[in-house]
Design a protein with these regions (language model features):
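Short cytosolic juxtamembrane segments of multi-pass membrane proteins
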Residues: 417-435
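Interfacial "coupling" helices/loops that link adjacent transmembrane helices in transporter permeases
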Residues: 22, 314-356, 427-431
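Membrane transport/envelope proteins' first extracytoplasmic loop
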Residues: 1-29, 33-313, 322-325, 342, ...
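Alpha-helical transmembrane segments of integral membrane proteins, especially early/N-terminal helices
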Residues: 257-278, 315-326, 356-372, 403-406, ...
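Alpha-helical transmembrane segments, especially those used as permease/efflux helices
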Residues: 1-4, 9, 24-28, 42, ...
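Alpha-helical transmembrane segments of multi-pass membrane proteins
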Residues: 17-24, 342, 346-359, 367, ...
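Short juxtamembrane loops and helix-capping segments at transmembrane helix boundaries
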Residues: 280-291, 371-394, 456-475
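Small-residue-rich transmembrane alpha-helices
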Residues: 318-320, 329, 353-383, 396-420, ...
Length: 501
């Protein structure tokens, strides 16, 4: 063994052989390290998959339309909005005047040459096998290519005639009806045939029926008002495709002068600079983003990961120590044949490296498989469909690297202890007389009290999660240092305890 490369190569071969020889211990350590990696990698892939891309989100909101016009009910006064249409306000300040109210004329804002598809929603009570069910009524020509992606057909077909409706899968499960059943509404004599089932990707648990424009809401609203009951409260938005299929930010601002908000595909895919957004120039308005919240999330994640790694190291370390003790004759032979302390440490550390790499591979593969297996269940729990699978190689590699690092850290102390043994003690198996340290319990007690104080200070007087993590780690290491003294103390106190039955 002359070079660093050959030294570590031989150490890894020895460690791999020992890991295969002692399968039970190796599997125990592998499981302790791989389980957290499994959970974190599955969580990472699940979170990334649940985060829709801009294109996926637009398909659910706009279908294949270029823009969506919405009347905010401000009476048609000029307004300002942000690019993603989540914030808007009148251009004029109404501090000392009544707030504008009323409907705007959407038709005046529609560009020449546009193709328009109306999208109207209202509410009504529909008769089911279990009684009346308050249901959202969605009037949209869902079979139109412009609406593709907003509603996902599961069976049958979307309405093609006035007397046909489609219903969400959740509505059919709740109502006890099925495709082919007749559907009626309170106060309305007309019957409708359910011709298909569908789902809303963002609202899997929505009770909704779909009909052609004017087929259900208008007659139902008229019948309810005739019976002196609350109407369907319909609201309409307009989906548009424009020549060139590009609804720019300038076009959005022009439509805003008619008191209409716009959700534009082009603007959401390519938002303008903050300086070009008049809304953000007004006092009290901003994009609402906070860098501090991102820092807090990262700090919290780092704290949890750091403490988890410490726990795993403390749990897996004794297993490596036991392995090194069982292999002390083998390590003694290495020393007897010219190996020095560096080679002994390398062999024990290689055991941690081998187990760490195996844990990284097993944990990552099982985490990805778990994500695939649990996806339908998670979608039902969250009530929305995930997007396509988004693998982040750097993130998954970083998670796997944590397994390797944890294995190495867990093997450091056993490696140092093994390298300190003499060749004679290793070959004969004699450990000699070992006295417990009187300094270690004192250091442990001081570390525990200091760590607890730091963690308490960090959690109550500051917002620094790193302080909490550091204090917790110091306190935990203090408890570890106190453990031999505590075991001895309880052992001496056991003489006064009765015998177990």
């Amino acid at each position: 063994v002359r070079t660093w490369y050959h030294s570590w190569r031989a150490a890894i071969r020895i460690a791999r052989r020992d890991a295969w020889r002692f399968k039970g211990r190796s599997f125990l350590v592998l499981a302790m390290i791989a389980l957290p990696i499994l959970g974190v990698s599955a969580m990472d892939l699940t979170i990334r998959t649940s985060e829709l891309t801009a294109s996926e989100s637009l398909d659910r909101d706009l279908g294949r339309a270029d823009a969506k016009f919405t009347d905010p009910g401000l009476g048609g006064v000029p307004i300002l909005q942000n690019p993603d249409n989540t914030q808007y306000t009148p251009v004029k300040d109404y501090d000392n005047e009544p707030w504008p109210d009323g409907k705007a004329d959407v038709t005046k804002a529609i560009p020449v040459g546009s193709r328009v598809l109306t999208d109207t929603t209202g509410n009504g009570k529909l008769r089911t096998k279990h009684g009346l069910l308050n249901t959202r009524i969605h009037e949209l020509k869902a079979a139109d290519p412009m609406a593709k992606g907003m509603l996902r057909l599961n069976s049958g077909h979307f309405p093609e005639k006035t007397g046909e409706v489609a219903a969400t899968t959740h509505f059919l499960e709740t109502s006890g009806l099925r495709v082919g059943s007749k559907l009626t509404a309170r106060s309305l004599d007309a019957d409708y045939r359910i011709v298909g089932s569908y789902e809303l990707p963002n609202e899997l648990k929505a009770d909704e029926v779909n009909a052609l424009p004017g087929a259900l809401l208008a007659p139902l609203d008229k019948a309810l008002k005739a019976d002196q009951l609350p109407g369907t409260d319909p609201s309409t938005v307009h989906l548009l495709t424009v020549p060139g299929h590009s609804f720019t930010w300038n076009m959005v601002q022009k439509v805003n002068t008619f008191g209409i908000t716009v959700d534009s595909r082009t603007v959401r895919m390519h938002p303008p600079a903050k300086a070009d957004i008049p809304l953000y120039q007004k006092s009290g308005w901003s994009d609402g983003r906070s860098e501090g919240s991102d820092v807090t999330v990262l700090a919290s994640a780092a704290t949890v990961i750091g403490l988890a790694m410490l726990e795993i190291c403390l749990l897996a370390g004794p297993a490596f120590a036991v392995g090194a003790r069982r292999s002390r004759r083998q390590l003694g032979l290495v020393g007897a044949n010219g190996g020095d302390r560096r080679h002994i440490r390398a062999i024990v550390l290689a055991g941690g490296l081998v187990i760490g790499v195996a844990s990284a591979v097993v944990g990552s593969i099982l985490g990805i498989a778990l994500t695939f297996a649990l996806r339908p269940t998670l979608e039902n729990l969250t009530g929305q469909r995930f997007g396509s699978y988004h693998f982040r190689p750097l993130e998954l590699a970083g998670i796997a690297a944590l397994a390797v690092l944890t294995g190495l850290l867990a093997a450091i102390v056993p490696a140092i202890n093994a390298s300190r043994q003499t060749v004679l003690a290793s070959l004969t198996g004699r450990r000699g007389i070992r006295r417990s340290s009187r300094v270690l319990p004192v250091v442990g007690l001081i570390a525990f009290l200091l760590g607890a104080a730091i963690a308490l200070y960090g959690s109550t007087l500051t917002d620094q999660f790193a302080i909490v993590a550091g204090g917790s780690a110091i306190a935990e290491l203090g408890v570890v240092a106190l453990t031999p003294a505590l075991v001895g103390l309880f052992g001496r106190g056991g003489r006064w305890l009765p015998l177990s039955p």
